[in-house]
């Protein structure tokens, strides 16, 4: 038995300079797990609650001392003495103790930090790397793959202070044979994009996720700049590198008018018009994945978009599904989207995260493992992507150590696993096999 002997919570700082929760779980035998909760900027309305103190005299109200107190008191008292290797039981104890539908008593940030720290401690006690332990928890021991990265190299929307409405323009280095090579291709395109933007007189400051955040004239111009950068780097768009976008449409959807208002371009669209706008972009550029291409509540719009684009484009639900099996189940039954974005802190525990990945895969949906815009040096999502053989990961650009930490962990894992973890490339993307 991997007996829990101590649980410690503390307030640390994330990549945006805001507080977040870090937890340590200590086991008999001296094994320790350490994990931190990430934090989102554009959040789905049905996400589990991230508990903030609201005390304006500390961190502008964003302190997390209440969540930390829950870790150090109620949660610690409930799990000390329990077996850390029973992850589902530990997570359920915390969920039941919280007692709310959205983890609002203790905060998903408190429960998640302990959940992940517990898994890390249990893995250490078994002498396993975290990815191997996650594969065991997932019921797929020894089954691994290296994920295709979606690298967010131009940031807009809520992730940047600019006039670009679409939140993320991403590259996927599909021509790579290994994860390490994919990272190299991404880096080369990133540096060439800096040169392209500079030559056009644009700012090369970066956004929350390490991508550039210039004031471009249109969303199409962002794609044109990326195309030029790919070619300057010596690669062919569509063959070596494909494109993906996160529209984060809920951020520019006007619920009163029912229109998608792209202020950066001075244009507005009905739900169906916006789908056809995206369809035109897909004809002009090799865009193989679109995330949140409609407002999270516009299920009719999503159904139409799935009908129009779903055979050839991966349609990823983020704000739409919020890593929640109840919502995902309904989406699967209604034929909404064909992929889910997986974010630990949207649901708030490792067990529930694994359940969402399994449900998606069983239904023929893909699962894209994702960071949040507020991150730390914690690289657990790298192990999650490999240990569940998810096939795809979204963890930012080629700058900011909070992003690069995940790529570096993937490089280490690939080195350790060798040919036991194949890099699937474009085959991992829905509609591209």
UniProtKB/Swiss-Prot annotation:
This is Enolase. Pfam families: Enolase_C (PF00113), Enolase_N (PF03952). Pathway: Carbohydrate degradation; glycolysis; pyruvate from D-glyceraldehyde 3-phosphate: step 4/5. Belongs to the enolase family. (2R)-2-phosphoglycerate binds at residues 167, 343, 372-373, 394. Its EC number is 4.2.1.11. Its main location: cytoplasm. Catalyzes the reversible conversion of 2-phosphoglycerate (2-PG) into phosphoenolpyruvate (PEP). It is essential for the degradation of carbohydrates via glycolysis. Binds a second Mg(2+) ion via substrate during catalysis. The active site is at 209 (proton donor), 343 (proton acceptor).
């Amino acid at each position: 038995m991997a007996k829990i002997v101590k649980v410690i919570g503390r307030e640390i700082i994330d990549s945006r300079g805001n507080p977040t929760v870090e937890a340590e779980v200590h086991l008999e035998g001296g094994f320790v797990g350490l994990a931190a909760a990430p934090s989102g900027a554009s959040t789905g309305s049905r996400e589990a609650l991230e508990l903030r103190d609201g005390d304006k005299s500390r961190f502008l109200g964003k302190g997390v001392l209440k969540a930390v107190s829950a870790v150090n008191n109620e949660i610690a008292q409930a799990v000390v003495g329990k077996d850390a290797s029973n992850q589902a039981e530990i997570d359920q104890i915390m969920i039941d103790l919280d007692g709310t539908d959205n983890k609002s008593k203790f905060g998903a940030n408190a429960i998640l930090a302990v959940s992940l720290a517990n898994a890390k401690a249990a893995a250490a006690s078994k002498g396993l790397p975290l990815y191997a332990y996650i594969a065991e928890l997932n019921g797929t021991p020894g089954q691994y793959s290296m994920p295709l990265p979606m690298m967010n190299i131009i940031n807009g929307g809520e992730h940047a202070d600019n006039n670009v409405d679409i939140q993320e323009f991403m590259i996927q280095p599909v021509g790579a044979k290994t994860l390490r090579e994919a990272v190299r291709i991404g880096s080369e395109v990133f540096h060439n994009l800096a040169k392209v933007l500079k030559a056009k007189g644009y700012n090369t400051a970066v956004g929350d996720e390490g991508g550039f955040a210039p004031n471009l004239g249109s969303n199409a111009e962002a794609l044109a700049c990326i195309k030029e950068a790919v070619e300057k780097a010596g690669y062919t768009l569509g063959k070596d590198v494909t494109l993906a976008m996160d529209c984060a449409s809920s951020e520019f959807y006007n619920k009163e008018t029912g229109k998608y208002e792209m202020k950066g371009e001075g244009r507005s669209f009905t739900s169906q018009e916006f789908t056809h706008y995206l369809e035109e972009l897909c004809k002009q550029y090799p865009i193989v994945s679109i995330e949140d291409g409609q407002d999270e509540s516009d299920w009719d719009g999503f159904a139409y978009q799935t009908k129009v684009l779903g055979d050839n484009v991966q349609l990823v639900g983020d704000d739409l599904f919020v890593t929640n099996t109840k919502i995902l189940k309904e989406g699967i039954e209604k034929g909404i989207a064909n992929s889910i974005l997986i974010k630990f802190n949207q649901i708030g525990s490792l067990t529930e995260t694994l359940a969402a990945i399994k449900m998606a895969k069983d239904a023929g949906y893909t699962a894209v493992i994702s960071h949040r815009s507020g991150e730390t040096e914690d690289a657990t999502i790298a192990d999650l992507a490999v240990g569940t053989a998810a096939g795809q990961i979204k963890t930012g650009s080629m700058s900011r150590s909070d992003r690069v930490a995940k790529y570096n962990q993937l490089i280490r894992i690939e080195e350790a696993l060798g040919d036991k973890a194949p890099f699937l490339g474009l085959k991992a993307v829905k509609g591209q096999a």
